[in-house]
């Protein structure tokens, strides 16, 4: 009996985590919109193989009109709205956006809850087209709307 109790004690957190993971993936799959807040970021500039990274201010935006069948969505912020291409997998949504100047924006929203915030874990990368090359990586959460 004691052995069985120990086995259940060890397995129970795994069962809870699996159930939580399934719920997070369902939340992601059913989201028609996501409000994303990226509080932590780092920006990197480099020239001639010399890299300089520094912290960067965070930001937020909303991904609306998510259509997994067509594979697209719309990014909406205070600066306006833009078209996004989307790759929809059961456990993640990748949103890709391009600016007129050639910058690439990639946002990945995971079917995994942030334990302290309750939202879905997310990252946002910006790859600037200008020279010298500049990139930034943002970390945060997205809440389904």
What is each of the regions a protein language model found here?
Residues 2-8:
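Sec-dependent signal peptide recognition
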Residues 13-18:
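N-terminal signal peptide c-region/cleavage motif recognized by signal peptidases
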Residues 19-26, 125-132:
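Short, intrinsically disordered, charge-biased short linear motifs at domain edges
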Residues 25, 30-72, 106-112:
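Short, solvent-exposed loop/hinge segments that bridge or flank secondary-structure elements
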Residues 55, 127-145:
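Edge beta-strand at a domain terminus
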Residues 58, 104-110, 121-123, 134-138:
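Short, surface-exposed coil-to-beta transition loops
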Residues 68-107:
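Contiguous, well-ordered beta-strand patches that form the walls/edges
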